């Protein structure tokens, strides 16, 4: 039995969205996230670790992925999962498009597919489908260089629900974006 | 080499605070957390898993514990750790005193020792001491039955920095308490 149905959808750019995770994906995530120039090395490492944990632990990891493949090569991805001890709240941990493919609408497409997947009920750690997602949270930094990121989330319908002062470092707050799904 | 210096301090109740984790502690945590009547079974399971992860992974787990032992039997504990990708922010994951020993000031004592430990610089995943904690976060529910918990955090100097509506479930918000250490 396949552990998760593969989500496949074509995109005007020619890319294909898939929900399965492949052994070559950790390296692809390192390339995609690194290409954006937005993240510290230790943050790139965290992004890669989530894919590795999904590969090693399967659904028990509770990390779910969507990859956008162009000519069988990943050029963007989203990573999300249910928040433990909540009923229907999800974290969107990562969403990134390779620098060479930004501005094509692929980020919006990945976000829409991720939300559709969460609403449809992803498999839980035991393989049984979870109830539909009610709310999605995204955390990001208040540093001005993230302004394009904020605008992307806002275009996708997310609003700032909380700000934690000096969370990442002195002068670097955490912004918590949220969106109710329905 | 011991992986973490044991913190030992006596308390008027006769209990001793220790920072080492023992193989019998998962069962002790189940007893302590279960005795409070505050938590769902799946939440008790999460509390126990954190101790198990510390025992199996050691410092790499990034979970730190303080136990209050009375006659060598744990009657309360705190669990905390550095928040990945932050400089000096910590989560206090759990703090609980066995129902039979509440009202003795042991919760306050555990909180003060936990803050002192975070300020002193706990060992990181590589064993080297982390910089002192700047900020501590505690998450809890908005459900009225948690009112004694809110009052405890407030007496310890924590204030509500954010509220995430319907986070745990419809009508059950997440409150994020924070305190700046110095």
Q: Can you name each region flagged by the protein language model?
A:
Chain A
Residues 1-24, 179-182:
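Conserved N-terminal entry element of GNAT/NAT acetyltransferase domains
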Residues 4-10, 120-132:
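Intrinsically disordered, low-complexity terminal tails and inter-domain linkers enriched
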Residues 19-102, 108-113, 117-124, 163, ...:
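Acetyl-CoA-dependent GNAT
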Residues 63, 172-176:
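Short hydrophobic/aromatic beta-strand or adjacent loop that forms the aromatic wall/cage
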Residues 87-89, 150, 161, 167, ...:
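A short, glycine- and basic residue-enriched loop/turn
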Residues 94-96, 137-139, 176:
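Short aromatic/hydrophobic contact patches that present stacked aromatics
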Residues 102, 127-149, 167-172:
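Conserved beta-strand-loop-alpha-helix junction that forms the acyl-donor binding cleft
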Residues 153, 158:
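Conserved active-site tyrosine of GNAT-family acetyltransferases
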């Amino acid at each position: 039995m396949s552990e998760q149905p593969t989500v496949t959808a074509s995109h005007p750019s020619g890319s294909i969205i898939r929900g399965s995770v492949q052994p070559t994906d950790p390296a692809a995530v390192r390339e995609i996230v690194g290409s954006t120039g937005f993240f510290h090395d230790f943050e790139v490492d965290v992004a890669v670790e989530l894919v590795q944990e999904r590969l090693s632990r399967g659904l028990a990891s509770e990390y779910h992925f969507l990859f956008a493949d162009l000519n069988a090569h990943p050029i963007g991805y989203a990573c999300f999962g249910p928040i433990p001890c909540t009923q229907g709240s999800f974290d969107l941990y990562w969403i990134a498009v390779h620098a060479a493919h930004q501005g094509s609408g692929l980020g919006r497409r990945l976000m829409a597919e991720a939300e559709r997947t969460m609403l449809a009920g992803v498999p839980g750690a035991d393989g049984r489908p979870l109830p539909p997602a009610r709310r999605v949270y995204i955390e990001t930094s208040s540093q001005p260089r993230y302004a394009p990121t904020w605008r992307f989330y806002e275009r996708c319908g997310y609003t700032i629900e909380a700000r934690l002062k000096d969370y990442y470092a002195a002068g670097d707050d955490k912004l918590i974006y949220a969106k109710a799904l329905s």
